[in-house]
A protein has these predicted regions:
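Long C-terminal interaction/binding lobes of large macromolecular proteins
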Residues: 276
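Oxyanion-binding "anion nests"
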Residues: 273
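Pseudouridine synthase
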Residues: 18, 166-173, 213, 283-342
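Short, P/G- and charge-enriched loop/turn segments at secondary-structure junctions
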Residues: 127, 137-138, 259-266, 326-331
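RNA pseudouridine synthases
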Residues: 1-255, 267-270
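Acidic/polar residues at beta-strand termini and the immediately following turn/coil
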Residues: 253-254, 262, 314
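A sequence-level detector of short linear motifs
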Residues: 48, 260-261, 299
Length: 343
């Protein structure tokens, strides 16, 4: 039998959602069946799964240690058969529930990737390579509270993994939380801190992360309702003469991860709106302050390129010969686009 006491970071989520994360090898139907049979209890009582968890709640799971281990660490497929504790007899289900040290940097010699896959399932933790440890030194914690962390992401780092072997800011977040005592490895089974907004790999700047259910919910609400102003700085090709607010429609080609802009609405297109102010301008380059009205993938890069002012260093949407020139002459290895303010 396993007992789990809900912490402040885990409170606010539904009981069944917690169980799905805690026992990723079990189906939702199986977990609901265990709730009905009282093989899983909340505060010593039968529960339905819809209950909102609060700090101090006690969860009791009446599984054998072997069964618990199997459901927590599924190795190959899902298996909903299990051995209950001897006091309960044997059952087989049908399938179906388809702050201290916070400013301290993690010990990079011991740093590991603790995240699994992008959905939080499967995978194995692994040690970081020397190159990954060195690159992580560029990450900075800009702000911390009980529920939220704010990071500076360097250009060249993924926000989230694209494949299992990648390192990312989300991986760094988990490692940072473990190394600084914000959360333990054991607690990751019930709640995983996560970034709330993403930047393109080669864009630097501010990324928000929730380190509690409350924090993640609050950030998600602000981003969804667009109550958070997102501002960027970028250096673009050519002379931009005046401030402007531009609009259009965007489609994305998943195969080559590239967007196209349209003046009129096209099939599958999303409406986008971008505002910019000219901070400084010469005949060859302009420094712009960008405000994202909408927030679609590659919006700034694609939108500015569509009006003749691609971002410096942006090979996907800009001029390759020009970007090669500034790369070798000025050392510009990434697109000069930076998320610098969230208000």
């Amino acid at each position: 039998m396993k007992e789990i006491t809900i912490t402040k970071r885990e409170e606010g989520q539904r009981f069944d959602k917690f169980l799905i994360k805690y026992l990723p090898g079990a189906s939702s139907g199986f977990l609901h069946k265990m709730l009905r049979k009282k093989n899983i209890k909340l505060n010593g009582k039968k529960a339905e799964g819809r209950e909102k968890l609060t700090a101090g709640d006690l969860i009791q799971i009446f599984f054998s240690d072997e069964t618990l281990e199997k459901f927590q660490n599924p190795q190959s497929g899902r298996d909903d058969s299990y051995e209950a504790d001897s006091s309960m007899g044997n059952h087989k289900s049908d399938r179906g529930f388809g702050q201290s040290g916070r400013n301290r940097q993690p010990d990079r010699e011991q740093a590991k990737v603790y995240t699994k896959d992008r959905a939080g399932n499967g995978g194995q933790e692994r040690k970081l390579t020397k190159e990954e440890r060195e690159f992580r030194k560029q990450v900075r914690v800009l702000y911390s509270s009980e529920d939220i962390l704010v990071f500076h992401k360097p250009a060249g780092m993924l926000s989230q993994r694209a494949k299992a072997s990648d390192d990312s800011l989300n991986d760094y977040l988990i490692d940072y939380c473990i190394q600084t005592g914000i959360i333990s490895k054991e607690e990751l089974a019930g709640f995983r801190p996560s970034i709330a907004n993403r930047l393109d790999r080669n864009t630097s700047g501010i990324v928000l992360a929730g380190i509690s259910i409350k924090g993640l919910q609050r950030l998600a609400s602000m981003l969804r309702e667009r109550t958070l102003g997102k501002y960027y700085l970028c250096l673009v090709e050519g002379k931009v003469k005046e401030d402007a607010r531009i609009a259009g429609y965007l489609t994305k080609e998943e195969k080559n991860n590239k967007v196209s802009l349209h003046k009129e609405k096209a099939e599958g297109a999303s409406y986008i709106e971008t505002e910019y102010r000219v901070l400084k301008s010469t005949d060859k380059a302009s420094l712009l302050k960008i405000r994202l009205i909408t927030g679609k993938s590659h919006q700034i890069r694609g939108h500015l390129a569509s009006v003749g002012h691609p971002v410096f260093g942006d090979y996907k949407y800009g001029n390759r010969d020009f970007n090669n020139q500034i790369k070798w002459k000025d050392g510009v290895n990434y697109q000069l686009l930076h998320s610098y303010e969230l208000v």
